Amino acid sequence: MSVHKTAILSAVISALFTSGAGQAAEALTAVGDGEGQLDIVAWPGYIERGESDKAYDWVTGFEQETGCKVNVKTAATSDEMVSLMTKGGYDLVTASGDASLRLIAGKRVQPIDPTLIPNWKTLDPRLKDGPWYTVENITYGTPYQWGPNVLMYNTNVFKTPPVSWSVVFEPQDLPDGKPNKGRVQAYDGPIYIADAALYLKTAKPELNIVDPYQLTETQYKAVLDLLRAQQPLVHRYWHDATVQMSDVKNEGVAASSSWGYMVNGLVADKQPVASTIPQEGATGWADTTMLHAEAKHPNCAYKWMNWSLQPKVQGDVAAWFGSLPVVPEACKGNELLGAEGCETNGFDLFDKIAFWKTPQAEGGKYVPYSRWTQDYIAIMGGR
């Protein structure tokens, strides 16, 4: 799915969002001296200062250059990010598409001025004006990284890459002759409903699913039925990267949705693991650095947004996280990422990814995210 061509929102929702655009009046007109501090909510592994590996540090140089000391609060899910931003006390958040529109609608983030970010001109054209951070032609953040939700698998179990997501959704024996029950994982977040919908788009074409984030009642019921049938198969609903890596190493997990971050970490640890994007395609995420509506350190925030778009920073983040840079130039000449890093992580798969976005009712045509949340919690609980 090519998300930049997707219709953004219904007229009703657009009107709601536009009402929140008044915050732009208080936005910076020029970037001045930093306030000395910057507080960021981020995914684990997104803001590294060399503590995990000395080679991966894109914070120390920023602090030395700007005088802005960076404090990071990690969040394991988009729902946690929305909760933290609602409580306040942070300047920036690295929001995925299933959080960004909620933050905009809830007036928790403010518009930014791309003309105050010199490196904006280096952005990948495919990401400019993405509907997950642009509403009514107003820009609500700076792209940071993107990537697919891959199918991770144990190479001792699968001698060739699995061709379908059915290995995690449908009861079956895996290639080693043993059942998949208790050996697969699913993501611990309502947005995973879209993964099931994407699978059924191919597996049950009679449902006529076009967009896995826009499900009619009939389509939605079929997706929930699939997820309820999957529940007894699931070893764990994962959201913590470290826990999933441990499960793969120690608990016999043979297949799961995952991120490049975990796959790369397990491969580096000499584990028999690889990843693939099956025939049905994959969901994915395009993360945006968004500015809190009441940010206390806006100058440091703008300095960070510009810093984050440097090719070296983008390439280093992509190498560490197993993601893809939003600046194409970052794919070249990065020692950590390597010459084939962008290709390996899926740089050319953009149009095959159904990027996360917040499901909207659009006048009652589709099932909204609030229902996704209620129903997925029930499914994970076995109801």
Across the structure, where does each feature detected by a protein language model lie?
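Extracytoplasmic ligand-binding site segments that recognize negatively charged/polar headgroups
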Residues: 48-54, 94, 99-243
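Early extracytoplasmic/lumenal segment of secretory-pathway proteins
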Residues: 25-103
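A bilobed periplasmic-binding-protein/Venus flytrap-type ligand-binding module shared by bacterial periplasmic
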Residues: 152-157, 198-201, 285-297, 316
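Paired acidic/hydrophobic, glycine-rich loop segments that form the ligand-binding mouth/hinge
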Residues: 91-95, 237, 254-259, 274-275
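Conserved C-terminal helix/tail region of periplasmic/extracytoplasmic solute-binding proteins
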Residues: 352-383
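Periplasmic-binding protein-like
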Residues: 122, 221-230, 269-293
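A ligand-binding cleft/hinge motif common to bilobed small-molecule-binding domains
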Residues: 99-102, 256-272
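Mature extracytoplasmic/periplasmic domains
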Residues: 292-356
